[in-house]
């Protein structure tokens, strides 16, 4: 199993409901279907949603939707866990999406994020210009953005540490990893706190 997939699975706690924003081919929906009563996968690609639908079959606990990633029809405080894996860097209105995620997550719910590490790309001298990567931030900037959106950072670490295969180094020297994994906790609304 790919290291990043295993790492994300290790951090996902059990809960009642999970939403996977930018679910792609549904790898995490498939892997996590036994841990949740309800799973929702959303992606902008109809092909990805169709493929995921074939993978999960007629499981009535799984809802797949093709649509934009910044407005959802779900009630407030509905989900226990949100996955946003390799998705936030593609979103034009990041602030609106994070506000919407905050709205649909219960207080104390976890959002697990993976994003490319722009700092590593600069340091390594490899300019990977991807026109679909709209948001290219350093790990510190990602954490500030999430905090501003009402999340508390529980954990951040590197994934795919390029030089040494040390898990300890990946946790401590996160700015050198090719990808950053962040676990953030949804804080209560300020007016309700």
What spans do the regions from the language model cover?
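Conserved N-terminal segment of class I S-adenosyl-L-methionine
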Residues: 1-75, 81-85, 98, 135-140, ...
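Short glycine-centered segments of the SAM/dcSAM-binding site in methyltransferase folds
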Residues: 17, 109-110
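Short N-terminal helix/helix-N-cap motif within the alpha/beta-hydrolase-1
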Residues: 47, 92-96, 123
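Short, glycine-/aromatic-enriched active-site segment of Class I SAM-dependent methyltransferases
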Residues: 114-134
